[in-house]
Amino acid sequence: MSTPHINSKKDDFSDIVLMPGDPVRAKYIAEKYLSNFVQVNDTRLMLAYTGFYKNRKISIMSHGIGIPSASLYTRELIIEFNVKKIIRIGTCGAVRDDIKLRDIVISMGASTDSKVNRIRFNDHDFAAIADFDMIYNIVSISKKMKIKVSIGNFFTTDSFYNDDKKMLNILKKYNIIGVDMETAGIYGVASELKVQALSICTVSDHITNKEFLSSKERESSFNDMIELALESVL
């Protein structure tokens, strides 16, 4: 059943969807890792593909930038297409000195400056957390693959350009491992609709050190993260 944002049939998607923010990255993942894949959505250029990874049916779909976009697509995938497991595979910023560019970080939970989870939780704080089984599994797989990962809490912000030094100091004080624009929203939707979700990101920007990867590097240099996510759902 198509929606205003996803022009696909009911069975076009796997029950497992990996979600990068960038549609170009979704296309890259499908072409590099999936066999017998087909494009199942191009509405609003939010590209989606379904194919097979080691005989497991997998879908890849971009979610765009920010909580509103990511929440919209995850909600429609869950309600209209029976998706049961979502892994965000994206980029994030870092503030801690021990976290470097290209490090892989996994979000146990995510606080946010958005009001989205307060809206759904009667204006109270909501603990937006990942699914435990997914965390346990991906950490186990990372050890087998000898891929270093760091685990901690994210801060999901509505503002990409923010030079608030006071806030940066707070993020460091509370040991925030990654700063992104989607995770808290995805975890909120997943919790409300009773499905599994996990956010795994590669550090593309170090906010306090003012280091960053180029747009070209962001497109295709995150293979370890992608392979880790794919292996974790077999």
UniProtKB/Swiss-Prot annotation:
Its EC number is 2.4.2.1. One of its GO terms (molecular function) is purine-nucleoside phosphorylase activity. The active site is at 205 (proton donor). It is an enzyme of class 2 (transferase). A purine D-ribonucleoside binds at residues 5, 180-182, 204-205. Phosphate binds at residues 21, 25, 44, 88-91. Signal peptide: none annotated. The record marks 218 as: Important for catalytic activity. The keyword Transferase applies. GO terms for biological process: purine nucleoside catabolic process. Homohexamer; trimer of homodimers. Belongs to the PNP/UDP phosphorylase family. This is Purine nucleoside phosphorylase DeoD-type. It comes from Buchnera aphidicola subsp. Acyrthosiphon pisum (strain APS). The lineage of its organism: Bacteria, Pseudomonadati, Pseudomonadota, Gammaproteobacteria, Enterobacterales.
